[in-house]
Every structure is written in structure tokens, then in C-alpha cells.
């Protein structure tokens, strides 16, 4: 009686072995892949071992967290045929072997999990198929496609009396995964303090909790500092130039007063202005990163470098933003040089203005490359502008229907960015217009003589007739 249970167990094991032999064995595995770069060729290999007859091999792409499986390739052993299910891909994959799929030019959209399903016939009956599968994650990388360095809050004015914070923004787009972004100054890496949130531009100079550090030898030496101070003294001994936005006086500057004339008077460029405060310590830099995922799987990275600007030191300093990424063989780089504006070039049209013309005075360049973008302010020396305003902000000043009274008037263009300010003066020469008799135009350039009176009477009579 005791042998009966053991006999039954032996019979069950023997039956299971017989069933396994009838069904056959099948093992499937997919060779792992390192991350690949978009545009490269990729081969997905599905290795399997079996002693049965193959029925089919099916490749799936898994999406939506595994809830959707999209057939991308099928090998049908019954008919010895293979075909693609990837209509949108226009058969970008080729069957190299029965278990291998090749993507000649992989895309970022190909990133994700894949599964290989293999089916064999059951030895006991051809109506039954035994299945096994393996899976792999295809990690597709993409190098950044663009890099740009801009100044935050640009254009911004020049600060003459107090220090102000300045921020450079490096924008890197098109990378997957997110690249590493860092800054250099004059070719040397910047040791920046990581920051989660940047201070406001008006919150005053940014401070560092680390111990005090002396001046950077690469940025400031005695010669450069002495040159800056001597230039500052020289310019202010010669008189204070026009600044950021001082309290403006409508009294004409005697040094700029010139009697009206019809001669061509060139523009007068006033020397640049420097601030009256000087830093004596190395600037402290603060760095913050932000990441914005894109709809295509890439990431836009913005690196913001903030410090307290010192025009004496930072003017003509070279800042570079560099990017490291596993899909790049060498770092990407973008450079900017901080430069204060110097000598705006003024163009006036028409070159020979007559009474009643519309005159345009335009800044069309500088004597140097300027960064960041400057802001422009126009004023009339000793008086208000033609429209009655005290100043006009913009690159182009438009004077409509200029009257004869503007002949000889002087206009000042102030170009400024956080690194400095410069003034340019130009004189407007207005010639007589033979089509407009003398004395028939008021200060707004409109007709006020007999012809104008007759025109007014005609218009009034027309209105009366229409009303009746």
C-alpha cells in the first residue's frame, strides 16, 4: 500500500517528460544593445533554440507603458514569407536572418521597448503552437542641434551709480538625453555657485557665502585697472557726458550750440561713460539650469550664469558656453564678447531735407561689435521733440513734415547697454521748399496761408451742402 503513492508520482513525472518531448523545447533571448545615435544603423537580434518546427517569428514595438503592442515585422514559416507592418516607415527594416531585424537609419521616435515572439508547432498536434518571447529596450540618443548665448532682460540700460546683476543665458536644443552645459571666461572654466532660483535684477548685487577671494589674475591686472581708472578720471575731468536717464534740462548746452546754417555738419561723437564705482574683488558667479522636455523626446536646456557686472573688468571679456553630450565626439561651443557701444553711426534720409519732408534719423551700426543689444534714446538738445515729447526710445527717430523752425536743431542719440553708454549728436539742416511759399507753414508743417483758408472754406461748404 505504501508503494502506491510513489508509483503514482513516478508515473506523473514520466508523463510530464513524455509531454515535454512531444511539445519540444524553445528558448528565446535578445542580444543587449548599447545606446545608439540617431541616424546610425541598428540590428535587433532575436536568438532562439528549439528542437521543434518553427511556425513564425513576430517583432513587436511596445508603446504606452506596455498596453499597446504594434507589429513591426513577421516571418511566416508556413509560407516562407516575411513582410513588414510598418507602413509609415516604408519598409526601413530588412530581414537579415529569420530572427534579425535591421533599421538602417534609426530615429528618436524608434526609442523604446521591443519584443521578439517565436512560435513552434507542438509535436503532438500541428493545431497547437508553443510560444516564447524576449525583450529589449532600444535607447536612441540625439546630439544637440543648436546652441545660443543671449543676455537676459535685453536691452537694458547702463547703471552709472550702482552695481547691477547681469545674466547670460545659454540655450541648448535638440539633445537626448539632456546635455551637460557649463561656462568659461577667457578660455578658463568658471567656478560657479549652484543656484536653484536666480535673484531679481533689482535685488542688488548677488552675494556668496563662501570665503572672500582676491582678484582673478587673468581678468584684472594692475595695468588694466590703472587704465580704467585713468580713463574714468580723464572723461570726468572733461565734463560729465550724457548718462543713463539723468534729470534732463531743456536749457541748451552752450558747448553744443551752433548757429543755424545750410552747411553739412558732421555728427559729433561724445566719449563713452564709465560708472563711478569700482569692484575690488573677483566676481562671484551663480549658475542655474532648467530643462524643458520636447514633444519629440528631446530636451531643451537653459543654463543661466549670473554675477554682479563690473564694466571696468567685464568689458571685452570673452564668455563661452560649452556642451558635452555622449552623442558628440567633441564639445559644442558658442561665444560672446561683452562690449559697450562705441560711436553709433547715424544715417539721415533724405540727405537734403526740405520744409514739409518727413525726416528719418537712423542708427545703422557702430564702430565696434556690441553685446548685449543696446537700447537707444533720442532727445533734442535744448528743446522738446517735434511731437512735444521729451524723448523717444527706438533705433529710428521720425520727424514728420519738418517746419523751417527746425533748421539747425541738434539731436542726441544715446546708445547704452549694461557695460557702458555713448552719445552721438547730429544736426538737422532744413532747406527751403519751392513748392511751399515762405511763411505759409506753421510749426507743424501744415498750410496756414490763403490757399489753406480757401481749402478750409471749400470743405466747410461741402459739409453744409451734404447736411442740407
Curated annotation (Swiss-Prot):
Which residues does the UniProt record annotate as the domain Ig-like?
25-132, 344-429
What does gene deletion cause? Mutants grow normally. They show an impaired sensorimotor gating with no effect on motor activity and coordination.
Question: Where expressed (tissues)?
Answer: Expressed in brain (at protein levels). Highly expressed in the pyramidal cell layer of the dorsal and ventral hippocampal CA1 and CA3 regions, layers 5 and 6 of the cortex, the thalamus and the pons and weakly expressed in the cerebellum. Expressed in neurons but not in glia.
> Would you indicate the residue range of the signal peptide?
1-24
Topology with regard to the membrane? Lipid-anchor; GPI-anchor
The record ties this protein, via SUPFAM superfamilies, to: Immunoglobulin (SSF48726)
What the entry lists under InterPro entries is as follows: Ig-like_dom, Ig-like_dom_sf, Ig-like_fold, Ig_sub, Ig_V-set, Nectin/Nectin-like
Q: Name one Pfam family in it.
A: V-set
Q: Which cysteines are joined by disulfide bonds?
A: 46-116
- GO biological process, alphabetically ordered: synapse maturation; trans-synaptic signaling, modulating synaptic transmission
What job does the chain carry out? Involved in synaptic inhibition in the brain. Selectively regulates inhibitory presynaptic differentiation through interacting with presynaptic NRXN2.
Q: How does it assemble?
A: Interacts (Ig-like 1 domain) with NRXN2 (via Laminin G-like 1 domain) in a trans-interaction manner.
Q: What is this protein called?
A: Immunoglobulin superfamily member 21
Species: Mus musculus (Mouse)
Amino acid at each position: 500500500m505504501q508503494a502506491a503513492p510513489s508509483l503514482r508520482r513516478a508515473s506523473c513525472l514520466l508523463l510530464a517528460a513524455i509531454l515535454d518531448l512531444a511539445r519540444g523545447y524553445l528558448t528565446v533571448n535578445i542580444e543587449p544593445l548599447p545606446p545608439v545615435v540617431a541616424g546610425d544603423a541598428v540590428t535587433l537580434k532575436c536568438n532562439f533554440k528549439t528542437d521543434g518546427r518553427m511556425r513564425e517569428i513576430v517583432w513587436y514595438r511596445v508603446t504606452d507603458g506596455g498596453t499597446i503592442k504594434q507589429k513591426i515585422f513577421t516571418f511566416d514559416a508556413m509560407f516562407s514569407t516575411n513582410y513588414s507592418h510598418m507602413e509609415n516607415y516604408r519598409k526601413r527594416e530588412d530581414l537579415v536572418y529569420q530572427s534579425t531585424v535591421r533599421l538602417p537609419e534609426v530615429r528618436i521616435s524608434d526609442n523604446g521597448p521591443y519584443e521578439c515572439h517565436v512560435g513552434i508547432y507542438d509535436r503532438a498536434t500541428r493545431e497547437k503552437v508553443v510560444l516564447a518571447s524576449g525583450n529589449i529596450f532600444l535607447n536612441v540618443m540625439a546630439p544637440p542641434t543648436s546652441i545660443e548665448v543671449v543676455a537676459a532682460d535685453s536691452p537694458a540700460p547702463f547703471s552709472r551709480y550702482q552695481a547691477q546683476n547681469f545674466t547670460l543665458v545659454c540655450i541648448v536644443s535638440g539633445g537626448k538625453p539632456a546635455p551637460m552645459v557649463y561656462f568659461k571666461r577667457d578660455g578658463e572654466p568658471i567656478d560657479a555657485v549652484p543656484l536653484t532660483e536666480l535673484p531679481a535684477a533689482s535685488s542688488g548685487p548677488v552675494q556668496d557665502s563662501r570665503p572672500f577671494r582676491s582678484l582673478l589674475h587673468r581678468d584684472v591686472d594692475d595695468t588694466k585697472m590703472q587704465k580704467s581708472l585713468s580713463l574714468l578720471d580723464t572723461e570726468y575731468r572733461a565734463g560729465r557726458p550724457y548718462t543713463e536717464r539723468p534729470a534732463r534740462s531743456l536749457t541748451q548746452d552752450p558747448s553744443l550750440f551752433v548757429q543755424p546754417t545750410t552747411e553739412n555738419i558732421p555728427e559729433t561723437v561724445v566719449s563713452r561713460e564709465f560708472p563711478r564705482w569700482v569692484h575690488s574683488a573677483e566676481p562671484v558667479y551663480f549658475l542655474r539650469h532648467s530643462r524643458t522636455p520636447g514633444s519629440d523626446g528631446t530636451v531643451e536646456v537653459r543654463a543661466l550664469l549670473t554675477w554682479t557686472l563690473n564694466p571696468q573688468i567685464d568689458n571685452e571679456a570673452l564668455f563661452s558656453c560649452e556642451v558635452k553630450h555622449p552623442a558628440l565626439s567633441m564639445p559644442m561651443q558658442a561665444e560672446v564678447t561683452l562690449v559697450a557701444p562705441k560711436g553709433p553711426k547715424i544715417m539721415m534720409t533724405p540727405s537734403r531735407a526740405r520744409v514739409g519732408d518727413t525726416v528719418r534719423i537712423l542708427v545703422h551700426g557702430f564702430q565696434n561689435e556690441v553685446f548685449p543689444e543696446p537700447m537707444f534714446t533720442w532727445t533734442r538738445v535744448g528743446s522738446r521733440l517735434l511731437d512735444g515729447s521729451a524723448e523717444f526710445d527706438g533705433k529710428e527717430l521720425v520727424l514728420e513734415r519738418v517746419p523751417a523752425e527746425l533748421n539747425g536743431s541738434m539731436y542726441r542719440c544715446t546708445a547704452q547697454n549694461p557695460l557702458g553708454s555713448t552719445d552721438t549728436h547730429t544736426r538737422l539742416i532744413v532747406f527751403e521748399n519751392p513748392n511751399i511759399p515762405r511763411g505759409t507753414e506753421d510749426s507743424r508743417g501744415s498750410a496756414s496761408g490763403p490757399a489753406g483758408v480757401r481749402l478750409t472754406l471749400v470743405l466747410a461748404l461741402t459739409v453744409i451742402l451734404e447736411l442740407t
